[in-house]
C-alpha cells in the first residue's frame, strides 16, 4: 500500500513538473541567480578573494527584498530558461586596501543585463562604497545590500546603459 502511494505520487510529480517549470518562467517574476558570480576578469585583491568567501551571496537577497518581482533560482540552467525575464549580475571590481578592519573605504562594482525571451532589453553598471568600523567582508556585504536596493529600484523601470549607485 505504501509503495503504491509513493509510486503514484512520484508519477504525478514527474508528469506535473514540466508544467510547473513552464509556469515559473512566465509568471511575470524576474529570475535572479541566488549567488552573484565574480567575473573571470574581475579586479579583486587576492586577499579579499581568499578571505571573503561569502562575497556575492547578499546581493541577490537584497535585490529580492527591494523588488517584489524577483524570484531567486539556484542554477544557471533555471536562470536562462527560454521564456520570461531574468537578470544576470556579476561582480566586476572590488577596491579594498588590505583585508582587515579600519583599512579605509571599500568599493564594489557590478554589471547586469535584463533578458526577456532570450534578448537583452536593458543593462546597467553600478558602484557603491561603504566605510564602517568592521572587517572588509562585512563592509563589502553592506555594499552588496546597497547595490541590491539600487538594482531593485532600477527593475521597476529598467533602461539600457543605466548607471546606478553612487558613481
Give short role names for the model-derived ranges.
Residues 44-48, 117-161:
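Short secondary-structure boundary motifs at beta->alpha junctions and helix caps
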Residues 10, 20-21, 85, 106, ...:
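Generic hydrophobic/packing signal
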Residues 4, 13, 23, 80, ...:
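Sterically constrained small-residue positions within well-ordered secondary structures
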Residues 66, 70, 75-121, 127-134:
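Surface-exposed short loop/turn segments
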Residues 49-55, 106-111, 143:
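Short, low-complexity, polar/charged sequence segments that are solvent-exposed and flexible
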Residues 3, 35, 51, 58, ...:
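Glutamate identity and glutamate-enriched acidic tracts
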Residues 1-9:
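Bacterial N-terminal signal peptides that target proteins for export
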Residues 8-69, 91, 125-127, 158-167:
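A structural "domain/chain start" motif
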Amino acid at each position: 500500500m505504501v509503495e503504491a502511494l509513493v509510486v503514484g505520487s512520484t508519477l504525478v510529480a514527474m508528469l506535473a513538473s514540466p508544467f510547473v517549470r513552464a509556469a515559473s518562467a512566465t509568471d511575470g517574476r524576474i529570475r535572479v541567480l541566488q549567488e552573484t558570480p565574480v567575473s573571470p576578469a574581475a579586479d579583486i585583491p587576492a586577499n579579499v578573494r581568499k578571505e571573503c568567501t561569502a562575497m556575492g551571496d547578499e546581493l541577490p537577497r537584497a535585490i529580492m527584498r527591494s523588488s517584489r518581482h524577483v524570484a531567486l533560482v539556484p542554477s544557471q540552467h533555471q536562470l536562462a530558461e527560454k521564456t520570461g525575464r531574468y537578470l544576470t549580475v556579476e561582480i566586476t571590481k572590488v577596491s579594498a586596501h588590505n583585508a582587515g578592519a579600519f583599512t579605509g573605504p571599500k568599493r564594489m562594482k557590478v554589471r547586469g543585463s535584463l533578458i526577456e525571451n532570450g534578448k537583452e532589453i536593458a543593462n546597467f553598471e553600478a558602484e557603491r562604497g561603504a566605510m564602517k568600523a568592521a572587517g572588509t567582508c562585512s563592509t563589502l556585504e553592506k555594499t552588496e545590500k546597497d547595490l541590491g536596493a539600487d538594482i531593485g529600484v532600477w527593475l521597476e523601470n529598467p533602461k539600457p546603459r543605466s548607471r546606478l549607485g553612487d558613481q
